[in-house]
Swiss-Prot record:
Role description: Acts on tyrosine phosphorylated proteins, low-MW aryl phosphates and natural and synthetic acyl phosphates with differences in substrate specificity between isoform 1 and isoform 2.
Activity regulation, short description: Inhibited by sulfhydryl reagents.
Organism, scientific name: Sus scrofa
Name listed for the protein in its UniProt record: Low molecular weight phosphotyrosine protein phosphatase
Biological classification of the source: Eukaryota, Metazoa, Chordata, Craniata, Vertebrata
SUPFAM superfamilies in UniProt: Phosphotyrosine protein phosphatases I
């Protein structure tokens, strides 16, 4: 039997309390359900340092629980080491992408492929909008988009 290679993905948004923790939790469930979780290192982080150490937004936690998913994530800011250790850094919008490309260019041994998670959306919704100032239906929309994108991403890279 061929040895499985471990892959790694880091989901990133502005504050790491809404979109990226949802994406991380969705992807964890997908790889667990497909019995490939041992092949993956999965995390999420923020571009900013605003929420370091905080739990995800209660609306994000509620949305995930509604779908039978739990998360114990605590927000953290992306580090230079992340660019050198993760295979994929998947972000939510163009502002994240600009910030990550700028930071990644400052890391000599950047190996991460930095992309928009929405680039994997079969419905072609490139941007995953921040639901922070929205309501429960906005969080549900983020969840559904993350499910579509994470499924397509996993299919492409496995």
């Amino acid at each position: 039997m061929a040895e499985q290679v471990t892959k790694s993905v880091l989901f990133v948004c502005l504050g790491n309390i809404c979109r990226s923790p949802i994406a991380e939790a969705v992807f964890r469930k997908l790889v667990t359900d497909q019995n490939v979780s041992d092949n993956w290192v999965i995390d999420s982080s923020a571009v900013s340092d605003w929420n370091v150490g905080r739990s995800p937004d209660p609306r994000a936690v509620s949305c995930l629980r509604h779908h039978g998913i739990n998360t114990a994530h605590k927000a953290r800011q992306i580090t230079k080491e992340d660019f050198a250790t993760f295979d994929y850094i998947l972000c939510m919008d163009e502002s994240n992408l600009r910030d990550l490309n700028r930071k990644g260019n400052q890391v000599k041994n950047c190996r991460a492929k930095i992309e928009l998670l929405g680039s994997y959306d079969p419905q072609k919704q490139l941007i995953i909008e921040d639901p922070y100032y929205g309501n429960d239906s906005d969080f549900e929309a983020v969840y559904q988009q993350c499910v579509r994108c994470c499924r397509a991403f996993l299919e492409k890279v496995r």
